[in-house]
C-alpha cells in the first residue's frame, strides 16, 4: 500500500479527511493534527510531525503548501514573510522534505484565492500578493523535480457560495473540487485510483476554531 503525507495550512484541513477516505484501501494518508501555518513553521516542525506521526522513511508522496500565512497582513502591516525570505525558505523546505522522505515524490500546491472584501480590516490577504508569492514559490522550485499543483488557478474563479468565509472552502462543493484536484494529482503520480466519496453524510476532521487558526 502506498503512503501519502499531506502538509499545509487550514486549506489542507478542509480536504485532508476527504482525500484519506477516498484513498482508503490503496494508500495510507497521514497529516499533522494541526494547522501547519506559514512556511517557516513547516521548516521548523516537519521532522517533529514525522516523528510524532510515526510516518516512517517509506513515504511515496508528500503534497504540501505554505503561503497564506506568509502573505497575511496584520493591522495594516506588511506581509508576515517578506518576498525575499519566502523565496529562500521554500527551497529549504523542499530540501528538508526530500531528506526526511527520501523515496517520496514531492508536490507543492499554490496558495488558494480569497474574497478580499470579506477579510477583516486587521487580518487581510490580497489576491495580487498571493499571486506574487505563488510565482515566487514556483520559480524557487524550478529544477528540483517538484510537481506543482496550481490550486490558485483552480479556486480563483469559484463562485462565492463555494467559500465558507473569506479564506476557506469548507462547503460541499469547495471540498469536492479542491479535494478532487488533490486526489487527481496524487493518483496520477502514484498510479492508483480513488474511490468516490459522497458528500452526503461525509464527516471532515473535527478541528476546533482555535486549531484551524485562520
Predicted features along the sequence, with ranges:
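A general structural signal for short secondary-structure boundary/capping elements
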Residues: 51-55, 78, 110-111, 154-155, ...
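Short, well-ordered alpha-helices that flank and scaffold nucleotide-derived cofactor binding pockets
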Residues: 17, 21, 51, 95, ...
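Catalytic His-Asp segment of secreted/periplasmic serine-dependent ester chemistry enzymes
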Residues: 112-214
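Conserved SGNH/GDSL esterase-like catalytic core that processes O-acyl groups on lipids
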Residues: 1-92, 203-214
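Alpha/beta-hydrolase-fold catalytic nucleophile elbow
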Residues: 65, 109-110
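Generic structural signal for residues in well-ordered beta-strands
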Residues: 27-29, 106, 148
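A short helix->loop->beta-strand "cap" motif at the edges of active sites that frequently abuts
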Residues: 101-105
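A general structural detector for well-ordered alpha-helical segments in enzyme core domains, enriched
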Residues: 86-96, 133-137
